Amino acid sequence: RRAQINYYRNEKKENLTIMVGNLNDMDLGQQYDYVVVNGVLEYAMSFTEGDTPYETFLRKMGSYLKDTGKLLIAIENKLGMKYFAGAPEDHTDIPFFGINGYPGNHSVRTFSKTELQELVKESGFPFQKFYYPYPDYKFPTEIFTDASLTTNHYGKNYPIYTDKTVDLFSETAGIEAMKKEQIADRFVNSFLLVAGKQELKEKEELLYVKLNQGRRKEFRTLTQLVRRDDSVWAEKKPLCPEAESFVAGLEKTGAQKPGKGFRNLPCRYENGGIVYQVLSGKTLEDRICDLVEKEQTGEILRTLKHVYEQVFAQRKREPEYQTEAFREVFGEHPGKDYYECVSPANIDLICANIFESGEDYEIIDYEWTFDFPIPAAFIMWRMIHELYCRIPKLGALYTQDDMNHEFGIESSDCEIFLAWTMHFTYEYAGSDSLDIYRKDRIPVDLSETVRTYREKKQFRSKLYYDTGAGLSEENSIETTVELNRGRFQVTFDLHNVENIRGIRWNLLSDTFCEVKVEVLD
C-alpha cells in the first residue's frame, strides 16, 4: 500500500523506480550518494536472518553507498519524553513497552541515542551527525540539532493523532527539566541520523529547520538557521512556486519601523529566498520569563505597556476598518463599531519575535504584516494570549483576563478576536490537513488511582454494642484494616466496656466476602 501511495504521488517523475520486497534479497547493481532508511530499521529483526539482524541490515545498506555517500536513518527514540508522559509505544500501541525493553516481542525494536550510535558505528559508519525532528520524524514541523535544542524552544505542545495517549505530566515541563540538566538529546522523541564511512564534510552547518507545509500553497515556507564561517544566518525559502511572491515581499517589509525604538530586522532577497543575520540577544519573552520567576508583576505590566505605547503610537480611530481586504484575511465576523487601528500592521507581533538591542528592539518573523488598518487591541490580544500559552506560571501572578483589561480588551472583544484568528488560521493561511484527526490526551489522576487501589486493599467496618439503651453511634467502634495474605482480619477490643447485652457488626466497604468469626471472648 505504501508503494502504491508513493507511485501515485510521483508517477510523473522519470528518475524514480519503486521496488517492493525484502531489500536484503535485492541486487540494485550500483552504488548511491544517499541511502534513506525511513521507519525501517526498527523492523530489521523481522526480515533479516542471523544473530545480529540490525547490524547485518545496516551493513547491507552500506554496500549500496559510495565511499563518500551518506546513510540517513529516521527512527523513534526508545526513551522519547512522549513515552514517559503517556504516549503508547508507536509500533505496538502498548504504554512503556519500549522503555521496558519490548518483553516477549521478536519483531520490532527502537533504540536510545547511545544504542543507536554504537549500532551504527559497529555497522561501518563511524562518522555521525544527529538531528532531532519534532514532534517526531513522521510529521515533523521542526528539526533541531545539538546547537539549537536548548535555544529554539524544543518541546512546545503539539497535536496527537492517537486516542490512547494519556496525560501523566507535562511533556514540555519534562523536556525543560532535561534541558537544564543538559541531557535533552537523550529524551527527544525521534532521531534523524546522518552517517558516513568517511568524515561528513559540509560547506555550511545546518542548525535548525522550521517547516510550514500545512499552510495554503501560496504561504508555504521553510525557515532554516545556517552557520557559515563564524556567522549564523536565517534563510526563509518558498516550499513551492506559489509561495515565491510571498517570500519576495518580505524584503520590503523588513525595512519598516513600527514604532519609536522598534524596527524590523532588515533582510535581503537572494537565490529565491530572504536572508538575515540571526540575533543572539534576549527576547522580550525571555525578559518577561525572568520577571515571572522573580514575581515582578509591575515590571511585566510596564514592559508590555511600553511596547503598546511605542508600536501603536500612531493608532487612530477607524469606524470602517472591516474593509474587503480585512474580511478576506479575518472573515465576516462582525466587530465593534470602531477600534483604534494601525497600518501597516504585524499581527504576529509576539514577545518571542522581539529582541532587545541596547535600548531599542528588533523584530523578526514579520511575514504576517498587512497594509490595511487592523485594531491595535487585536494585535495586543494575540501577544498576550501567546505569552500565557508559553509561560504558564504567568497566570498564577496575574490572570489573563486582568492582563487584557489593562489594555482595554473586554470579554466581548476576546470573542471577536478569537473568531478573526480562527478564520485567519484555518481559512486564509490554511491549517494542517491532519487537524481533523487530532485527538485529546486522556487525563489521568495518579493520586486518585492510588486512592482507588488502596481502597480495594482496605476493609472498613463498624461494631455497635448495646449496654441497655439500644444500638447507637455513640456506642460504636470503626476500624480500617489492610488486606494481608489474601484476607482481612478485624479485631475489636471491648474489655473496657461493661454490661454488653448485644452487638452488631456492619460492613462499610463494598466488598463481597466470606465472613468467619475466629474468636469471641
Segments from the language model and where they lie:
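A short glycine-rich, Lys/Arg-flanked "PGG" loop and its adjoining helix->strand segment in the class I
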Residues: G50-K70
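Conserved class I S-adenosyl-L-methionine
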Residues: K70-P95
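Catalytic activation segment of kinase domains across protein kinase-like and atypical kinase folds
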Residues: H91, P95-G104, E328-A396
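Short alpha-helix
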Residues: N105-F130
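Rossmann-like AdoMet/SAM-dependent catalytic core
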Residues: K129-Q224
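ATP-binding glycine-rich loop module of kinase domains
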Residues: Y208-G259, D286-I288
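Conserved structural core of kinase catalytic domains
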Residues: N264-G331
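C-lobe/activation-segment region of protein kinase-like
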Residues: G358-S447
